[in-house]
């Protein structure tokens, strides 16, 4: 797969969640119809919660803390907000001959693990508790959450990675429906980097990891 066929769109301002959904839905139609390139879209949302298709009412602990959006991605409740890098990935699995959802999710996981490794963070992808995890202070904590949707074999939604996120904002939900584990960020792990620094490595590792994903 030639990587000049993939567009990278990096936002400098926060993007409204509903606007992002509308954009992705139109873009995946265009990708399916062959009139637009595949896209990796890097952005940040204002503070909000999203409820995936597996969300349970009881996992919303505080219903007036931030706006709550029902969404068609897989997964349960999660938080998005400042200090969190969102990577929405829109790839055509069919043209890549990779109509294998599990393989796609694992490849996303490897991408994030390799990116974090560049910053000397040892992490791992857990296929059962979907996400990328680290061991910090003797306990396992999630640093990156996954939620995807596939339509006509074109992917959308993606990954959120905590860079310098206010972790107290997770207090209004049971993140991803998992009660027994915590949430962390690069800042909490002692890694202080900018979005710009992170994005450069994210793109480099994407090209490496996805080079065989075709």
Curated annotation (Swiss-Prot):
One of its GO terms (biological process) is protein modification process. One of its GO terms (molecular function) is lipoyl(octanoyl) transferase activity. Substrate binds at residues 73-80, 145-147, 158-160. GO terms for cellular component: cytoplasm. SUPFAM superfamilies: Class II aaRS and biotin synthetases. The record marks 142 as: Lowers pKa of active site Cys. It is found in: Cytoplasm. This is Octanoyltransferase.
